[in-house]
């Protein structure tokens, strides 16, 4: 087991005391109060883990001291207890090491979820709809709120494209490994010969960005307003409530027409634009860090095939960690998605521990 520097732990405990005292004194302004409250919430978990680790380590040292005693019965008792006590200390150390890993500053944020049908025509659009329902059900189980920002329905159902806000604490941390190409293998309802078809859809999960995260210069925006359109292209209202925002430097275009209010559509379009620009900035920074590249579970590239959903076999396979679950229906219902997410998070943590020299 890698030793955890005691002075680092003491510094964390001291910081926890300072933040607690500052908040208790009630002298922080509103902005500082919010930041300190978030910091304290994060520190509380780490401090609890430090205390658990130190208690377990002290118990192990006590058992090891008993092994040095002259009483044969005490030595025998200590020898019997040591494996269990040592395992408990190592488990506490591992839990603490994970909490001490570098944090992704976006993990606690809400997210923008984008799903686009890929190869496979109508079947791909139906699969994109299946994926959206999977994430919507998963979000419901987590107590998150899902709001569709824009959608382009498929001719036989599903979506050619759907963009939604998923609001809640820690959404990005749980969904960020979903970015990539998802493949489905099944017999379409329109297939008369019973042949299995392969289709695909791409998923992108972007951390929701606030104005403090990314500055958007109004002079860089081209904003067009128009009447909202229905599925067949017909205008569905008489006011120009739909908004299309083009960010000239990057070429990013966002179109939103879901709300009747132009003001609300503009706000939603700006939220999506900020998220895309923020993710672009994060990707550029990540690409510059070789250690981060080694620690990623998959690249997060939208073209990277990350998962296959095989209906005839009732299985889901995540190719990044070679994990197969024969729980296709449960995964698509959102109830078993955590099994995949937890495995991906664990793999990511193991890679980070190795990169930090703690694995």
Curated annotation (Swiss-Prot):
N5-methylglutamine: residues carrying this PTM: 234
Alphabetical list of Pfam families matching this protein: PCRF, RF-1
Protein keywords: Cytoplasm, Methylation, Protein biosynthesis
Description of post-translational modifications: Methylated by PrmC. Methylation increases the termination efficiency of RF1.
InterPro entries: PCRF, Pep_chain_release_fac_I, Pep_chain_release_fac_I_sf, Prokaryotic/Mito_RF, RF-1
Renumbered residue ranges of the record's region Disordered: 283-305
Entry annotated with the keyword Protein biosynthesis: yes
GO cellular component: cytoplasm
NCBIfam families: prfA, PRK00591.1
General function of this protein: Peptide chain release factor 1 directs the termination of translation in response to the peptide chain termination codons UAG and UAA.
This protein's name: Peptide chain release factor 1
Lineage: Bacteria, Pseudomonadati, Pseudomonadota, Alphaproteobacteria, Hyphomicrobiales
GN (gene name): prfA
